């Protein structure tokens, strides 16, 4: 009688564990995608590395210390202005990383 109960419990545990294993996700989670809010789009006049002379000079004047980061010297894209509001340079998405509307750091290029 004890052997029969032990066999039933063992079978139940094996079945339960196999169901949990089958229900668990396989592989890594899908990567998250970056989202750009409309207000965070900017039109960059130039895109420069932080080690370039013009970018380093501007960063020095602003007191910003960066290493190995792309610095984007940008002017914002405006919604007002109709056809004249198109970006003819480098459109990017930036979030909370601008310094006095002169430069933005670590922006992501986007296509409009």
UniProtKB/Swiss-Prot annotation:
Induction: A CT-rich motif, which is often found immediately upstream of the transcription start point of highly expressed filamentous fungal genes, is present at the expected position. SMART domains: HYDRO. CDD domains: hydrophobin_I. One of its GO terms (cellular component) is extracellular region. Glycans are attached at residue 96. Disulfide bonds join 36-93, 43-87, 44-74, 94-107. GO terms for molecular function: structural constituent of cell wall. Keywords: Cell wall, Disulfide bond, Glycoprotein, Secreted, Signal. It is found in: Secreted; Secreted, Cell wall. Self-assembles to form functional amyloid fibrils called rodlets. Self-assembly into fibrillar rodlets occurs spontaneously at hydrophobic:hydrophilic interfaces and the rodlets further associate laterally to form amphipathic monolayers. Aerial growth, conidiation, and dispersal of filamentous fungi in the environment rely upon a capability of their secreting small amphipathic proteins called hydrophobins (HPBs) with low sequence identity. Class I can self-assemble into an outermost layer of rodlet bundles on aerial cell surfaces, conferring cellular hydrophobicity that supports fungal growth, development and dispersal; whereas Class II form highly ordered films at water-air interfaces through intermolecular interactions but contribute nothing to the rodlet structure. Belongs to the fungal hydrophobin family. This is Class I hydrophobin 7.
